[in-house]
Amino acid sequence: QPQPDQANHTVDFVLTVNPGRKYYVNQIHISGNNKTRDAVIRREMRQTEAAPYDSAKLNRSKDRIQLLGYFDDVKVETRPLPDTPDQVDVDVSVKERSTGSVEVAAGWVQDTGLVLSAGVAQDNLFGTGKSANFRIARGKTQNTASLSFTDPYFTPDGVSLGYDIYYRGFMPYKSSSSSSSNNYETTRIGLGARMGVPITEYDRINFGLGVEHLTVKLHGDETYQPYRYRQFIQEHGEKNWIVKGN
């Protein structure tokens, strides 16, 4: 409302602001998660119960739930409470998808023959949000196996922890076309741990540490053994422990 001042030839303006009603979230209801536990979804919510309603936090909550990869569809809706005009309930409805896979394969490789492989993976283990996968492959000259497990919420604030175990055996001396450069074998058995620490809502730092046991063996006449492997054994021996970090 303008208030003119004739003496000083000025005009004052008075702005009157009437703040709107502030809404609070009463309860958050989750439905459609027949397998996934409620806690897995609730920990992604940035909008919390008994807190002021924030549309930005609600949208971010929906994005985080979708990024889990466990659901084909995610809907987040608000519902006013008839008896309490300053409160709303939040309804989160999800449509679950398959989060597991099984793979079986067979192939033929020249010189090594038949190669068989199989694997099983689950990204939402028992509905806990943890993931695990196992892979195995077997051939004439190479055998591998690996097992991985990840807990994305090892701590309540989102620090993740994962483990990896693997075996890799490489035996080119068994090849049907074994030559002077193939008379050796290597075996690697490793164990590692991974950790991820969130530093912002969108960024995190990942690092890991592992240990590997390496065995190198030579076969046949020394004349047909790779020089670099003979040199490695002379300097370090057949068996070694290796520490890895990233």
Identify the role of each PLM range.
Residues 25-30, 102-106:
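Disulfide-bonded cysteine-rich modules in secreted/extracellular proteins
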Residues 1, 12, 28-33, 57, ...:
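Acidic, glycine-rich loop-and-beta core segments that form the ion-binding/anion-interacting portion
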Residues 35-50:
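N-terminal periplasmic "start-of-domain" segments of outer-membrane beta-barrel proteins
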Residues 2-21, 82-99:
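Self-splicing inteins and homing endonuclease
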Residues 1-4, 22-27, 216-223:
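Interfacial loop/beta elements and low-complexity acidic/Ser/Thr-rich segments
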Residues 51-246:
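Gram-negative/organellar outer-membrane beta-barrel architecture
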Residues 6-8, 21, 34, 138-142:
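A generic beta-sheet turn/junction motif
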